[in-house]
């Protein structure tokens, strides 16, 4: 269950999005955060809430420095290119921020120094001599992505600050095993150097209380963070050996870690907005205003643990809610730029003439915000043709065309109680769904109103009535036009450009984007002139979709060829997306290994009675946390239809993060005798497929089914 948005209309709301990294192009994975956040902000404004919507480009950190060096330009030149790209792309998609800055803006440098100095003054920051990766051949220290090696927790290939290919854990300097320099490919060594640490360990009790009782948003974010806090927190190194970034106070040879100054950008961008609008940034960050962060699920740890601890330590307001999206797949394959499973917003979508609103609709309506979203060109075609064209577009166009041809204006009429009740119910459901960050539910409720409109139009047969009783026909069309007005308002947060066209076609002179939901119940004024309607949505034809599928297939083939070259020892430099050649080769090699044929061992046949002894059920994962002292085990709580959740221990930490499992339906062997693994009792087994070690995939039903359902 998601914790609802506050109903207090008196409090201003700040909505933010996780910052796009200014190191590569916008892809559909980015939009899983930005489009729902824009929908949410638009909807709040329609409810009459005071909303400020800010974001900006994340411009610091080693990936940007590494990529700039490869391209032979400065980091500043690189981030300017991509900052402009993201700004333009968001506007094309109808995502409009009140401020869109960069973390290299003076406001962010100043605010970061203010917060860091405040933490130093309150004794939350201390110096410590630690081991830092150093390359003797390059004669330089190697922070973050300048070094790779084995993750100390799961053994997978990892970067200096994160195990991105394995368990997903944040890594501190010096933790990486068998370090290798990504610049020259040679072995690195560890040398001692003074760095500065934030006393994150002192915030365990505060964070436990905050996450359990105060933080709203989506449960996947809270549960994931609570799992880490329960394990115990370690202090966090907040400095790096780089020239590019925000200087650490009093140390010209150090900058603050990117995950310090990046979230502080939320405050800096609010300051930029306030300076331009003549308003106050303190009402959010020092006052009672609400702060809602929309993020990708992969940065939950930073936003629910590091960030609120820093803010609390520096006496700033903490987030009211964190809304974490589910992951994105492409054509049922795990999203991977290296393997070609990616959809670029510009070259794959906008540049081919697809309307921005169609993609916004897909992202909002495909599934619940916290669940995994699969992008498929065929599914896009099906949804647009069956829903936007056949239902919403059909009702709006046939209503407006009939009214324009036969009346030219809004005819005389009264809003019927049945129609009014349907609109009121839709508004109620949409508002409730938005408050719970359930965008699919909101869209489904709005589409149900469009379906009602089609039924109303069809059942009253105005094409016959116009010949028999023009006045009675006018009454029907008046109500249809009123439904069209209501639908335009309700769908505006999701389809802003298309609904603006419909709004103007209805002769409405006000700004639909500034109009409130409540206007959906204000009677249309008879005599209002109607414009000749435009066809709002057109079918996506097979040949057009086939063309896009072929482009996608060619990309995967090219990636496979590159992967084969990498496996054969040829290293092709990567000039985009922040992935160095060493990393790209390793990821490609791992992907190739996963696709190799695995010999299948055939087991002896058994009688049906043997199979019948197995109590195999469908379970819903409620909670997941890593098992202490283990790199591979997860403690999982599963609802299998019993009075209390069943506790299992699953060896999946190397293949799934906690947030990827929570909410999923899985297959459980329920009558396996209890066993203790690393001191934790497991009362059953979560079933999975294993291809020999490279890939483990949990068995999951292809549709939701009641927990406890038997598998026979």
Curated annotation (Swiss-Prot):
Zn(2+) binds at residues 151, 154, 163, 167. Coiled coil: none annotated. SUPFAM superfamilies: Anticodon-binding domain of a subclass of class I aminoacyl-tRNA synthetases, Methionyl-tRNA synthetase (MetRS), Zn-domain, Nucleic acid-binding proteins, Nucleotidylyl transferase. Keywords: Aminoacyl-tRNA synthetase, ATP-binding, Cytoplasm, Ligase, Metal-binding, Nucleotide-binding, Protein biosynthesis, RNA-binding, tRNA-binding, Zinc. Binds 1 zinc ion per subunit. Pfam families: Anticodon_3 (PF19303), tRNA-synt_1g (PF09334), tRNA_bind (PF01588). Residues 559-585 are annotated as: Disordered. Its EC number is 6.1.1.10. It comes from the Archaea. Residues 610-712 form the tRNA-binding domain. GO terms for cellular component: aminoacyl-tRNA synthetase multienzyme complex; cytosol. Its cofactor is Zn(2+). InterPro entries: Anticodon_Met, Met-tRNA-synth_bsu_C, Met-tRNA_ligase_1, Met-tRNA_synth, Methionyl/Leucyl_tRNA_Synth, MetRS_core, MetRS_Zn, NA-bd_OB-fold. The keyword Metal-binding applies. GO terms for molecular function: ATP binding; metal ion binding; methionine-tRNA ligase activity; tRNA binding. A motif ('KMSKS' region) lies at residues 334-338. HAMAP family: Met_tRNA_synth_type1. Homodimer. Belongs to the class-I aminoacyl-tRNA synthetase family. MetG type 1 subfamily. Is required not only for elongation of protein synthesis but also for the initiation of all mRNA translation through initiator tRNA(fMet) aminoacylation. This is Methionine--tRNA ligase. It comes from Methanosarcina acetivorans (strain ATCC 35395 / DSM 2834 / JCM 12185 / C2A).
């Amino acid at each position: 269950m998601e914790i609802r948005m506050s109903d207090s209309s008196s409090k201003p709301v700040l909505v933010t999005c996780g910052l796009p990294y200014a190191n590569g192009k916008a892809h559909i994975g980015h939009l899983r955060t930005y489009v729902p956040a824009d929908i949410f902000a638009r909807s709040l404004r329609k409810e009459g809430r005071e909303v400020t919507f800010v974001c900006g480009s994340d411009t610091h950190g080693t990936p940007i420095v590494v990529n700039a060096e490869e391209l032979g330009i400065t980091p500043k030149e690189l981030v300017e290119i991509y900052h402009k790209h993201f700004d333009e792309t968001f506007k094309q998609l109808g995502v409009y921020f009140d401020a869109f800055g960069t973390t290299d803006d003076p406001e962010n440098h100043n605010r970061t120094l203010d917060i860091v100095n405040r933490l130093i003054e309150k004794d939350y920051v201390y110096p410590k001599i630690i081991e830092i990766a150093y390359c003797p051949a390059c004669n330089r220290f190697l922070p973050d992505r300048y070094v790779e090696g084995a993750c100390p927790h799961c053994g997978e290939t990892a970067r200096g600050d994160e195990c991105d290919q394995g368990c997903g854990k944040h890594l501190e300097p010096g933790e990486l095993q068998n370090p290798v320099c990504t610049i020259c490919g040679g072995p690195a060594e560890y040398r001692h150097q003074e760095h500065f640490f934030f006393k994150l360990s002192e915030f365990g009790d505060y964070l436990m209380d905050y996450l359990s009782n105060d933080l709203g948003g989506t449960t996947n974010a809270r549960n994931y963070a609570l799992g880490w806090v329960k394990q115990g927190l370690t202090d966090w190194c907040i400095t790096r050996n780089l020239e590019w970034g925000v200087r650490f106070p009093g140390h010209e040879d150090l900058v603050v870690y990117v995950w310090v100054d990046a979230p502080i950008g939320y405050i800096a961008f609010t300051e930029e907005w306030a300076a331009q609008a003549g308003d106050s940034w303190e009402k959010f960050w020092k006052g009672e205003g609400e702060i809602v962060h929309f993020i990708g699920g992969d940065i939950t740890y930073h936003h629910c643990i590091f960030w609120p601890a820093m803010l609390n330590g520096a006496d700033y307001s903490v987030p009211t809610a964190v809304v974490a999206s589910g992951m994105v797949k492409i054509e049922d394959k795990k999203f991977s730029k290296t393997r070609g499973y990616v959809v670029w917003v510009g070259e794959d979508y906008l540049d081919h003439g697809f309307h921005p609103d169609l993609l916004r609709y897909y992202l909002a309506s495909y599934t619940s915000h916290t669940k995994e979203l699969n992008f498929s060109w065929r599914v896009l075609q099906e949804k647009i043709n069956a829903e936007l064209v056949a239902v919403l577009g059909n009702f709006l166009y046939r209503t407006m065309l009939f009214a324009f041809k036969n009346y030219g204006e809004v005819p005389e009429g009264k809003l019927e109680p049945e129609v009014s009740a349907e609109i009121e119910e839709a508004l109620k459901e949409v508002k409730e769904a938005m408050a719970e960050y359930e965008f699919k539910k909101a869209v489904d409720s709005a589409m149900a109103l469009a379906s009602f409109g089609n039924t109303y139009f069809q059942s009253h047969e105005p094409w016959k009535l116009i010949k028999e009783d023009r006045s009675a026909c006018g009454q029907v069309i008046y109500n249809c036009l009123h439904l069209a007005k209501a639908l335009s308002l309700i769908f505006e947060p999701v389809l802003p450009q298309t609904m603006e066209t419909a709004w103007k076609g209805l002769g409405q002179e006000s700004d639909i984007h500034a109009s409130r939901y409540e206007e959906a119940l204000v009677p249309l004024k008879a005599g209002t002139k109607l414009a000749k309607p435009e066809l709002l949505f057109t079918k996506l034809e097979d040949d057009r979709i086939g063309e896009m599928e072929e482009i996608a297939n060619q990309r995967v083939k090219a990636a496979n060829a590159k992967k084969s070259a990498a496996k054969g020892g040829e290293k092709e430099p990567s000039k985009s997306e922040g992935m160095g050649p060493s990393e790209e080769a390793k990821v490609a090699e791992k992907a190739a290994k996963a696709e190799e044929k695995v010999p299948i061992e055939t087991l002896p046949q058994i009688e049906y009675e043997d199979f019948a002894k197995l109590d195999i059920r469908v379970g819903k994962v409620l909670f997941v946390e890593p098992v202490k002292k283990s790199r591979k085990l997860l403690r999982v709580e599963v609802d299998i239809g019993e009075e209390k959740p069943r506790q299992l221990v699953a060896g999946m930490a190397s293949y799934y993060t906690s947030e990827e499992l929570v909410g999923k339906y899985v297959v459980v062997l329920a009558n396996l005798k209890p066993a203790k693994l690393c001191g934790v009792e497991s009362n059953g087994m979560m079933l999975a497929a294993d291809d020999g070690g490279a890939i483990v995939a949990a068995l999951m039903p292809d549709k939701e089914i009641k927990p406890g359902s038997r598998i026979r």
